[in-house]
């Protein structure tokens, strides 16, 4: 089973991209998704084309590491799809997701080069507001897709692509919309192995705990709230 992680902040267009991936490649897919939004919202959009395994208890890179790993192994052993697409929550660290998958990878589970979608309209704001979380997704992706750029001027697309290149010089950053990509580009997404040396996180120093809890806490900014989530 090959595992493809498709990340992106909330609203970046992950579900739309996955549906196009399924349509263009016609492979045997299972999608493992989790969001903090209502249960089954994205799943309902996908189920007509592909099996969806929902994990709604929390972020797969934070609070439900064991459940996430167990779900991946269960999917591999029971459904045995050719490909597992992991759609993590938009507020998670891509480096942590890749690390958790890497821990259970073996000869029957291969991790592919991850894809991250970047909303062209929110790029500047997210990079400023979410800082390490947003940069982590960009720096750990093998392919960076600029989404929602259909009506943006080419100069804006090129400018965002240049900024992305500054954060991740080794990534594939096509400036043409993915719907216009040739068939071989889609097939390459399903065969390109993950570059192990890329994965890292800007958030270091938190303890490796199997369980941690809060009775309550106060935050002043959204970024501070997300940092507390990452410590769970």
Annotate each PLM feature.
Residues 2-125:
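Nucleotide-state-sensitive switch-loop elements of NTP-binding domains
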Residues 47-51, 132-134, 190-193:
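Short, hinge-like loop/turn segments at secondary-structure boundaries
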Residues 85, 109-118, 138-149, 166-178:
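Conserved beta-strand/loop subsegment of P-loop NTPase cores
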Residues 96-97, 129-130, 156-160:
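Residues at alpha-helix caps and immediate loop-helix transition turns in enzyme cores, especially N-
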Residues 102-109, 134-136, 161, 165-168:
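A short alpha->loop->secondary-structure connector
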Residues 123, 150-152:
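Short histidine/acidic/glycine/proline-rich micro-motifs that form metal-
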Residues 128-140:
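Flexible active-site lid/hinge loop adjacent to a nucleotide/diphosphate
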Residues 140, 152-232:
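C-terminal accessory "lid"/substrate-recognition subdomains
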